[in-house]
Swiss-Prot record:
Modified positions (N-acetylalanine) in chain numbering: A2
Organism: Arabidopsis thaliana
Keyword hit for Cell cycle: no
Alphabetically ordered keywords of this record: Acetylation
Annotated GO CC locations: cytosol
Subunit field text: Homodimer.
Lineage, broadest ranks: Eukaryota, Viridiplantae, Streptophyta, Embryophyta, Tracheophyta
Superkingdom of this protein's organism: Eukaryota
Protein name, per record: Uncharacterized protein At5g48480
């Protein structure tokens, strides 16, 4: 969905010219350790059922027989997409494992317990949900091998007089 009506004014000597700035895409970008994109993609496919929609490879290899390393990969998960990228391709950036990065994703599910179990089977570490998080509707939490925290929430069904079956 594009963002509209963001206006910028430019002059070229003849007077102001109005242009509209439109954003066509917004994606999360998750940085992982050098040459770990393939491992991350495998984990996210296994743990969460992510679907890879595209990737780019390192342009150079040491040997022709060597498998190329994945530089970045776009994954689709629960109607959203995010890019997993090799941190070595972006000087000055750090990975989610870096201290204080605080990268967290929230996934809505009908069965948080099963989601936690599947993520742990794929290599994540279970993290206890705090009392405050439970009050927010969070039912499970894991940290993946790449330092990202994943919170699982179960959607609550609120029954009111308006939507109550008779």
């Amino acid at each position: 969905m594009a963002q509209e009506d963001v206006t910028a004014v430019a002059t070229n000597g003849a007077g102001p010219v109005e242009t509209h700035l439109v954003f066509t895409e917004f994606k999360q970008m998750l940085l992982v350790e050098a040459q770990k994109v393939g491992d991350a993609v495998t984990f996210y496919k296994s743990a969460f059922g992510a679907i890879e929609s595209g990737h780019s490879l390192y342009p150079k290899r040491k040997l022709d027989q060597e498998l190329p390393h994945v530089l970045s990969s776009e994954l689709n998960l629960a109607g959203s997409s995010f890019v997993v990228c090799d941190v070595s391709s972006l000087p000055g950036f750090s990975t989610a494992k870096s201290e204080g990065s605080g990268v967290t994703f929230l996934l809505g599910t009908k069965d948080a317990e099963a989601a936690v179990a599947k993520a742990v089977d794929a290599g994540a570490v279970k993290v206890e949900v705090t009392e405050a998080e439970v009050e927010l509707g969070f039912k499970g939490k894991v940290t993946d091998p790449f330092g990202v925290t994943w919170i699982f929430a179960e959607k609550k069904t609120v029954i009111t007089d308006e939507n109550k079956e008779v």
